[in-house]
Amino acid sequence: MTVVANTGPLAARRKLGTELRVLRDRHGWTAEEVGAHLGCHISKVSRLELGKRACTKRDFESLMNLYDVDSDRRAELRELMLRSIQRTPPWWHAYNDVISANYAEFLTYEAEASHCREHQPLLIPGLVQTEAYARAVTTYGIDAVGPQQVDTLVEVRMRRQERLRESPPLQMDLVITEASLRVKVGGPATMKGQLCHLLSLREVENVSLRVIPFDAGEKGTSTGAFTLFATGVGPGVDAAFIESAETRTIFRDDPVAVRRLDRLFNHLTSAALPQEASATLIEHIAKEMEHSA
């Protein structure tokens, strides 16, 4: 096992949990037996192995002794454990006065993900919004906020976009609908600027943008917007966030729900135009916006 130097607390916790499960299975221990050894309920063992709970130093050493882990492997796993309990505040901690708990959890996954898949049926995804578009959406969105809060939330959204330029950058697969391109958010001029920005993404290798045209019919319909994150710790997607008018985002990490949304994203992708054809459609709509400005 190699510990990635820039592994964040969330990814480290999930990776350590996976390793603990492998060790338990290898030694033939049940979760109940491990819980008895630690002096805790089986639910704690389950949460440790799922990466939903940080492993304390005391529990870590107890588990390493139980599984008879050699010194080299123990040192690697200890590094993961220490990373998983790091308390360095993330950059968005400075915006806690306007960021909800759901949004903070979303930002945590976004910050540590290696791959993101997002579907938006009516709006442009946040990581590829222009500042003018983001301001219009935030000002007239479902949340009633004042001018100062709008400024702060837009600042957060612009800062989030640094993930696309980091090393290594976040890999993004975006699927939007033609409606997302035609709704004149902020007016024709703002929308045209947004469309031009989307066209510039053709030069960004880690961003894939595809559009579901109106003539895709029912194949391009879904119940709403959602985002899938993969941290690269294990195979597939780790978590999903579903947008809701009432709670803003609903977090799901149970495998069944995540796999269902991953399949839905694949279906939506199959209904979308290829990237070049999507760019052609965006160019066409941008010209229409120019004439109506």
Positions of PLM-derived features:
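Interdomain hinge/linker segments and adjacent boundary elements that couple functional modules
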Residues: T2-T18, R26, E32-A36, L50, ...
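The short coil/loop that forms the "turn" connecting the two helices of the helix-turn-helix
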Residues: W29, C40-H41
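C-terminal regulatory/effector modules of DNA-binding transcriptional regulators
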Residues: P168, V175, V185-A293
